[in-house]
Amino acid sequence: MRKPFIAGNWKMYKTPVEAAGFVRELIDSLKDVSGVDVAVCPPFPALWPVKEALEGSNIALGAQNMHFEKEGAFTGEVSPAMLQDIGVKYVILGHSERRAYFGETDELINQKIKAAFTWGLNPIFCVGETLEERERGITKAVVEIQVLKGLAGVTAEQAENLTIAYEPVWAIGTGKTATPDDAQEVCQFIRELLVKLFGREIADKVRIQYGGSVKPENIKELIAKPDIDGALVGGASLKVESFTAIVKGSI
């Protein structure tokens, strides 16, 4: 059985002071929760204060992006070595907002995924189709290209520590959600791709999250599906009450 995994993607919200205060409330709210892995992914400036606030808790630290090089003349970038040094465990890579607004390609995302593994970070690798692609009936073709290109050169041993987040782009921040059956269909397809890449044993260990307007009201239906192992939560991760409800609803 794969352990549920709920990760909060805070995007560009919360100052370092706000983030530390929020996390202290969240720790208290989740202190008696077990049977689920939980991570929060604050903006870069908040990583250190959040890391300090999380000490001794049952919540892991994640980042929202990284460069693939250890160091260098890359103004404005943050390296995997820096994230590892802070104590980051997870890193979101390939999010649709990075692809759309910052021109990230499948090839660049692949470099980042391999670098994350090299530095002992666990990628949360995001894939998903746009509304236009869904309406054209090419969801699986789009997701297949993203998965195969994104995971090129990744070993089966590394893939054991991989999380994939299926996030239909048209559902992110819109209030629209793929139906649980639609989400399951794509997540099952992703798992079958992983079987081809790494074999059944490894594919069955990889956790596949759903992302895209996840709320306390829909988490139970989503998590009940056999190939959905958790959620990458956006807006609802910014409030203690809603994020706690999603975490508890996943168990």
From Swiss-Prot:
InterPro entries: Aldolase_TIM (IPR013785), TIM_sf (IPR035990), TrioseP_Isoase_bac/euk (IPR022896), Triosephosphate_isomerase (IPR000652), Triosephosphate_isomerase_AS (IPR020861). Pathway: Carbohydrate biosynthesis; gluconeogenesis; Carbohydrate degradation; glycolysis; D-glyceraldehyde 3-phosphate from glycerone phosphate: step 1/1. Transmembrane segments: none annotated. Its EC number is 5.3.1.1. GO terms for molecular function: triose-phosphate isomerase activity. GO terms for biological process: gluconeogenesis; glyceraldehyde-3-phosphate biosynthetic process; glycerol catabolic process; glycolytic process. It is an enzyme of class 5 (isomerase). The active site is at H95, E167. PROSITE patterns: TIM_1, TIM_2. Substrate binds at N9, W10, K11, G173, S213, G234, G235. It comes from the Bacteria. GO terms for cellular component: cytosol. Keywords: Cytoplasm, Gluconeogenesis, Glycolysis, Isomerase. The keyword Isomerase applies. The keyword Isomerase applies. It holds the Pfam family TIM. It catalyses: D-glyceraldehyde 3-phosphate = dihydroxyacetone phosphate. Homodimer. NCBIfam families: tim (TIGR00419). PANTHER family: TRIOSEPHOSPHATE ISOMERASE. Involved in the gluconeogenesis. Catalyzes stereospecifically the conversion of dihydroxyacetone phosphate (DHAP) to D-glyceraldehyde-3-phosphate (G3P). Belongs to the triosephosphate isomerase family. This is Triosephosphate isomerase. It comes from Carboxydothermus hydrogenoformans (strain ATCC BAA-161 / DSM 6008 / Z-2901).
